[in-house]
Amino acid sequence: MTAPNHNWRKFKNSFMQTLTFACAILVVTPLVLVFYHLIKEGFSSINLAFFTQLPKPEGEIGGGMGNAIVGTFVLLGQAAVVGVPVGVLGGVFLSEYGGTKLNWAIRFAADILNGVPSINWGIVVWGLLVVPMHTYSALAGGVVLGMMMIPLVMRTTEEVLQLVPGGYREAALALGISKWKTIVQIVIRTAMKGIVTGVLLALARVAGETAPLIFTALGNENWPHKLTEPIAAMPLQIYNYAIGPYNDQHRQAWAGAFVLLLLVLFINIGVRFLTRDRFKPKT
């Protein structure tokens, strides 16, 4: 009886090990396929003109996505201005002034907002800014991306602040330091790497959004000049070129998708760099 039971346990162990390995491969496979196709279709189309020139009129060959690349960074900068202060301060409130029903409601609302489809955000900001201003604009695009960042930044900030040992707070208060100074000078400084990590993850999430920008930024064939004018962005340009009838536009859409993927990849590498010490074994 002992030998069959031992063999059965070995079989179950081998089966589960193989199953989990297969699932791990399935997780990695889509990423490999995405990289393969983007490199195959898009890398050959990347040159200096792609980064420095404006799009050519439809039907003409050449040009680039310089305006869309600049526009993407403009929108991300605005999104950070809108989303980071509100998200971080909201996370501080939830972490340091917690324990109330209001906090529970705020956490619940933030979790719900994290799952709201991005097109809904675009429709809301379209009604709040685009309609009253009578124009699509870079301002509206930055606001919608910033609003999408807020719940994610808030929740990640709350979580990293809660990892700060309570003894730090107690020691500061025992020395007569006020609570707000304790939070700003000790708690936030201690958790700064985690807060920056949350901000970068939120930026990586909104960097590739297209649907909300269709309702707010719209797109533009020229370089960005004013925040009150429509602005180009890489996700918008990729979408418009992908559905276009011209092969050269399709080629540039692949190149734009490859560059956008690299942008998100670099942001995630930055996150890994900031958090590398957190996972090292302590001696």
Regions found by a protein language model. Give the residues of each.
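Transmembrane-helix boundary motif in ABC transporter permease subunits
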Residues: 78-110, 123, 272-277
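Hydrophobic alpha-helical transmembrane segments of multipass integral membrane proteins
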Residues: 70, 74-82, 86, 90, ...
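Glycine/proline-centered hinge or cleavage motifs at structural transition points of membrane proteins
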Residues: 117, 175-176, 189
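C-terminal transmembrane helix and the adjacent membrane-cytosol boundary/short C-terminal tail
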Residues: 15-18, 158-162, 200, 240-283
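Interhelical loop and adjacent transmembrane-helix boundary motif
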Residues: 58-59, 213-261
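Periplasmic/extracellular loop-to-transmembrane helix junction in inner-membrane transport proteins
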Residues: 3-19, 36-79, 99, 237-251
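Generic hydrophobic transmembrane alpha-helix motif, especially the helices
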Residues: 111-147
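Transmembrane alpha-helices
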Residues: 157, 179-216
